[in-house]
Amino acid sequence: MVFGGHDQKGIQVIGSYGTGKSHLMGLVQLVAENADNLAELRNEQAREIMQPIAGKFMVHRFELQHNNSLWRIVTFEIQRFLDSHDIDYKFDENSLKSYGEQLSEMMAAFEDKYPDKGFILAIDEMLQFLRLRAESGNLESELPVLQALGQACNNTKFVFMFGVQELIYSAREFQFAADMLRKVKDRYRDLSIRREDVSYVVQKRLLDKTEQQKAIIREHLKPFTPFFADMHGKHREVCESVSRSPLIHREL
């Protein structure tokens, strides 16, 4: 994700339920919207990665309702954003122009008003919406919209990002539309949250401990080590993942 530039694509954030997709997307959006938030990041590498986008974007984030088409929902939400910022553009629901052409015109109007800013449009969860549209026989009419939103990110300051619990392209219930899915895939970059990522956050953010506290945990676990075959190989990981229990505080 950069501020404008060539060969840009939409962003698909992939992670199973509870892995923090919304938190990750929210973090990106907070920094992109306000450069002051960059200083709150504890990880130096994350700060370096996000420095180029800090404070460069305006953001509109929403959750999908399931009772309308994707294009109708997206244009309604973008229109709400445009109107709230006095940007002179109106989507015409009867227009014969392509999705891409309308998005291009919208961004031209946005940049006329805010030439030094980009626009992030973010949806928390896409997969359930697409599943329901597939069940009602409407998936194939939604995929061109996804393709157009991803393509609109190229050579503009528009960024479209959404969260999903698994890769859309490999979901079994969507394989009847495999050809169109491949075209959609070409317009997005995949950002996956792995199990190791979640474990790291838990250890470093939620269960962070001093070396003295870790030593107490190691001593406490020693009598139980023989009962678990893989405890020796994962002793450090287990110590990192144990919470700061009352036992530790009593020892201290």
Segments predicted by a language model, with ranges:
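Conserved P-loop NTPase "ATPase switch" module shared by AAA+ and STAND
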Residues: F110-L139
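Flexible phosphate/Mg2+-sensing switch loops adjacent to catalytic phosphate-binding sites
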Residues: I11, Q29-M58, H85-E101, V164, ...
